[in-house]
Each structure stands twice: as structure tokens, then as C-alpha cells.
Amino acid sequence: MSTPPLDLVLVSTPIGHLGSGRGGGVELTLTSLLRGLAARGHRITLVAPEGSVAPDDCPGLLLHTAGGSDQPSWQHAERAASVEIPCDGVLPHLWDLALSLGEDADAVINFSYDWLPLWLTPHAKSSLFHLVSMGSVSRAMDEVISQLARWDQRRMAFHTQRQAGDFSLTSPPSIVGNGFDLTRYQLQLNLDGPLGWAGRIAPEKGLEDAAAVAAALGETLLVWGLVEDADYAQSVEAAVPPGTLDWRGFQPTHHLQQELGCCRALLNTPKWNEAYGNVVVEAMACGVPVVAY
């Protein structure tokens, strides 16, 4: 490589172990970056919740895990909610590890959308950086992002200009779009396959709209994703004729792309500001048109 290799500590989301699907798009973003950075010769240490599985094609990657209680997700909290860290929470345990490992590293890179690592940044000896993974969902998060921007906005990057526009920043944002290894996706050109939908099964993803489309057409909708809100999933299923939804669960990329590639279209129906529509890119990489709003 043209520049000397760096010692980097990457910190995963505290919402579920890496490989569980609970972290949503953050998992795909993180694993893609792990592969890309390792391929460029950087020395990578990954800090993640207990049970996490690192990509098997990242030679030399060191995995350190921490246990503890799950961290609540900000997108399901009230907008005016206070910062919450459970007793024996995995989030502070992850950051105890990260700050210790980061003392001799060139940088510690945070992938979680959480108040604690953002607040720690001006106070830590390690050089902390953040890839902000969501738009505005909380006043507390808006405030800490704005405070960090005033202190040193170079410590943060965003996925898109639209996402960054949600926040009060002091200068134009740094944008890091997601990269995809297209060799991991097989192009399939099917004109008569089923309809598909993929994402976390939660209200902000708008599955009910895609289900209504499938019901109106008298077709089955293939649904991939972790059921994050079981009550919501049941209400969506109850609103359409029996058999409309074919639940496929969370699938790792190599399985998802095989099944998704058989569809004639992917319906994409988010009801919030998606920071980056990973599944839209994945569908197109498989040759599947996307119908979205």
C-alpha cells in the first residue's frame, strides 16, 4: 500500500452481537469496512458484544468481546427521552475495552449510534472518530452531535448529505458512502419472480405498505429481516389475507442475495430518513429493480 499501515480499533454496535442481524445496516457497513481496511494492510482490532462473529476473510483481525445488558435502541425511544444506560450495560463495557486498546492505536472508530462514545470524544486520550449511522431521532443525540461538531467536526462522518442535514453542524459534513463488494452478489435477471421486501421488522420500515401492495395484486411477498417488533409483525400479517407474507428471517449476505435475486422487484417502504439504503444497493447488485418512495 502507498501509505504506512495504521493500527485501528473498530467498535461495533451494542445492539446485539455482530452476526445476529439486530444491528441492522450497521452490521453490513462494519463488515464491509473490516474487509476493505484489512485488504489495504491496516492492523484491525474489533471490539464487539459477546457472541459476535468476525468475517473469516480478514487475516490478522483481533476480536475482543464484552458482555452485559443490551443497550436500548434510540430509534424506538421517545424523541424527548433521556439518555439511558442499563445496569451492567454492554455499552460502557465495550468502551472500557475500546479506550484501553485504543491507547496505542492510531484511531478508534465508533459505529454505534449512541450518546456515550460521542460524549467521551473530547475527554479521551485516544483519537475517537464516529460514522454516524442514523438521522435525527432524539433531542439528546442531536445535542451531543452538535456539541461534538462545535468541538471538532472532523471526528464525525455521515452516510449521505440528506442524513447529515438533520443535524446542526458547523461546516460541510464529511460523507462516507457505503461500499459493496459486488463479487459477493450474483446477477440474476428474473422477469416473473415474486415480490420481495427486506429490512428490520419494525414500524419505521413500513412493511405494511409493501404487504398492502402484495395483497392488492393477489401475490405473496417474500420478507427478509429480523423481527424486532413482534406485535408490529403480527398486526401487519393480520391486515392482509393469509399467506400474503412469506417470512424468511434474517439471512447473511450470501444467502440473502441468492433468494433476493429470484425476485422481479424489491419494494422499499421506509417511513423515516434512511441514512443509507443498503438493501436497495444489494437488490440492484442482484439485478432486481427497486420500487421505492
Q: Residue ranges of each PLM-predicted region?
A:
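Catalytic cores of nucleotide-sugar-dependent glycosyltransferases that transfer UDP/GDP/TDP-activated
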Residues: 1-293
